[in-house]
Amino acid sequence: MLFFTSPIGLGHATRDIAIAEKVKQIVNDEILFISGGAAYDLISKEGFQALNLYRPPSFTVDSGKLRNPFVWLMKYIIYYKRCKKIAEEVIRKASHKHPIIVSDEDFASIAVSQNIILSKNILIYDMVDPTANTINDKASRLAITSTYGNFKFENNIGETHFTSGFLHEIEKKMNRSMRHLINKCDKVIIPDYGDNKANLVYVGPIVREVKSERNSLRYNFGLTRKTILVCAGGTDAGRHLIQKSLEAYRKLKKRFDVDLILVSGPNLKLDDSNDFYNLGFVDNLHEYVYASDLVISLAGRSTIDESTVYGTPGIFIPIKNHFEQEQNALRLGYKYEDISKLERLIEEKLELSHQNPILNSRGAEVTARIISELL
């Protein structure tokens, strides 16, 4: 099985590790990951065979706001074309040995695999419209359609919205190509709750399994007080959120007996301080999410899912003008402007008790079984 993991951030890698671990429990099939950067490092550290081939463009983020989104979109299109060449070389060399292509939001590999007759392709995709409760709520406004036999319907899947005005015409063309690829996939795995239709399969949140009790983790991590976890993902885009979180924490620390752990990620280097714990990059972030009393993060999907499944209260501030993060945050009632209310939000959240984890969340296992059935 070839597993193409988007290297933009670390969320794709973390959930793909969870899926791969479950696949190994079901079938004895070789898994080869293709990714890049910090995502490659994380996957390799978990013991999986991986190729470090992708080099994604970086966002330009200033004060928590995405700048020049159209420039980034153009860089992404160039990156996509490069990835298609890389994916084509990998797939053509290995298609006889790996007839299944799994892609976590890497459309380049999906595009290549759909031109290879012997290959089956599975897409993991989480851009679901935040205001829709069922798959049909937005049917009248979305143009994505899937066909299964003679049955046709409109999928409740979102589109990219980085640009506006006449520039959006280029983005609309990209979205049409993306919809075409989605429609042709053998399966589209959506890590959310919803009604399965045609090639869409809603599996629920996909998170890594926590194998220790929460109290044991807290003891091992040395957590004795209420603990805030601040994490910024796999890029330096969270610098502004970290700074604002530390400002709010230092004010609250004068009134509350509370600690703060900072996980800044692999690309953001910050000075140490005596009033918080700076861990830098950790490969077991999910365990820290479970052990903490509050998570403050950008609105990346994987951290949100981990917070939800593990029962840890969270504050999720999106990058301004990053449509996907803004959608994720909207579902939880947050927006970028809430960054100015962090002190009050933290105080409110710390009053909440840690909830029981959702032990029946089986997104990784369900996805692994879908993959194994196509092997």
Predicted regions and their residues:
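A short, glycine/small-residue-rich beta-strand->loop->alpha-helix junction that serves as a flexible
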Residues: 5-17, 236-240
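Conserved nucleotide-sugar phosphate-binding/catalytic loop shared by glycosyltransferases and other
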Residues: 7, 29-80
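Donor-nucleotide binding loops and adjacent catalytic segments primarily
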Residues: 20-22, 212-294
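Conserved nucleotide-sugar donor-binding subdomain of glycosyltransferases
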Residues: 66-108, 152-154, 158-162, 168-169
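Active-site proximal beta-strand in glycosyltransferases
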Residues: 100, 116-135, 141-146
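A donor-sugar binding/catalytic signature common to diverse glycosyltransferases
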Residues: 101-105, 284-327
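A nucleotide-sugar donor-handling region in carbohydrate enzymes
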Residues: 147-236, 265-267
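C-terminal alpha-helical cap of glycosyltransferases
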Residues: 347-348, 359-375
